Amino acid sequence: MTEMSEKENEPDDAATHTPPGTVSTLQETKLQRFKRSLSLKTILRSKSVENFFLRSGSELKCPTEVLLTPPTPLPPPSPPPASTDRGLPTPTPSPCPVPRPLAPLKPVRLHSFQEHVFKRASPCELCHQLIVGNSKQGLRCKTCKVSVHLWCSEEISHQQCPGKTSTSFRRNFSSPLLVHAPPPACAMNKESPPTGTSGKVDPVYETLRYGTSLALMNRSSFSSTSESPTRSLSERDELTEDGEGSIRSSEEGPGDSVFTAPAESEGSGPEEKSPGQQPPKLPLRKDVGPMYSYVALYKFLPQENNDLALQPGDRIMLVDDSNEDWWKGKIGDRVGFFPANFVQRVRPGENVWRCCQPFSGNKEQGYMSLKENQICVGVSRSKDSDGFIRVSSGKKRGLVPADSLAEI
């Protein structure tokens, strides 16, 4: 026991017997070693973390950094160095892609509705029903002129407004109107058609101009269906009675040339030309002659001075049928206008019949019902063995017994 205690006390004694200078140096070296080990560990850990998050120049980034970090602005390109030698070309800097700033979003234009009283029947844009009423009928957009009901405006007010519609197209025209006033420098040339390199007129332009001219001619030649064409009668009379009647009205339809009366072959004329000065003579129409014979189906009382009164069974010589609803005809010495659906054409070989006894026939079996004094047209030679004649009256056609008909 005494030996062990002695051995344990030996290092203490050695420590106590060591000089104080050596003890301080030993403590300093241990402290330095500990600090070095700590600094080395921290350096290794920091490097490993940096290599993990910032590998090869920020190849991997956390999603938060990608979303939150703003894009680094590129430095402005350095100006090229001024070369002293003018003969050597200066190298142009390669264009680097510059990020374009995003265009600001335009605000969506919505409808701006205001109260409107519609003079014409207008459908609702949402429910497609007519807007009716006397006061405060509905709403209309101030920009695009869209009409809606008061109760339909809430659903359509959040839609985008297309804006003001263009007015380059007009009704009854398939192309924009080319009605620009010519400049004073080229006042003589009213319209210069676009020509190509070869000097030919553009076919598209030619087609559009032809269609526009046809539309204008049709609108000027045909009057409205609700009024009698009194004005066109006076214009035609002035044009046809001028001179010897050689001037033909330009308002007549293209189909009038088919029904032109043949020129008279009489050699009587006010002027006699020498045989050497006789140019090729064109057939001239002195007046619009009768074209076809028609029969009146119904009674028509004249409404204006230039109208022609009709009685059922009257024979009418057609003079002008350029208008679809009002025709010009002649009965004896009377000339005037009458409704086109009040007459029926009488072809060569046909007879005009008047019903003297009413007859009711089955339409499915090919018979036609007639009332008393009704006018119809048919061929007497078409009488079959049973005594029926095939006649027509307006849009109706069928077989009628010959005993109930009387020829006019």
From Swiss-Prot:
Xref: InterPro entries: C1-like_sf, PE/DAG-bd, SH3-like_dom_sf, SH3_domain, STAC1/2/3, Stac2_SH3
Carries keyword Magnesium?
Answer: no
Any idea where this protein resides?
Answer: Cytoplasm, Cytosol; Cell membrane; Cell membrane, Sarcolemma
Q: Write down the CDD domains for this protein, in alphabetical order.
A: C1_Stac2 (cd20881), SH3_Stac2_C (cd11985)
Any Pfam family the entry gives: C1_1
ZnF segments: Phorbol-ester/DAG-type? 110-161
The UniProt entry lists membrane topology as: Peripheral membrane protein
Q: Could you tell me where the Low complexity compositional bias lies?
A: 219-232
Family matches, as Gene3D superfamilies:
3.30.60.20, SH3 Domains (2.30.30.40)
The record's SUPFAM superfamilies line, in alphabetical order, gives: Cysteine-rich domain, SH3-domain
GO BP: any one term: positive regulation of protein localization to plasma membrane
Where Phosphoserine occurs along the chain?
S48
What assembly does the database describe for this protein?
Answer: Interacts (via SH3 domains) with CACNA1S. Interacts (via SH3 domains) with CACNA1C. Has much lower affinity for CACNA1C than for CACNA1S.
Q: What is this protein called?
A: SH3 and cysteine-rich domain-containing protein 2
What is the taxonomic lineage of the source species? Eukaryota, Metazoa, Chordata, Craniata, Vertebrata
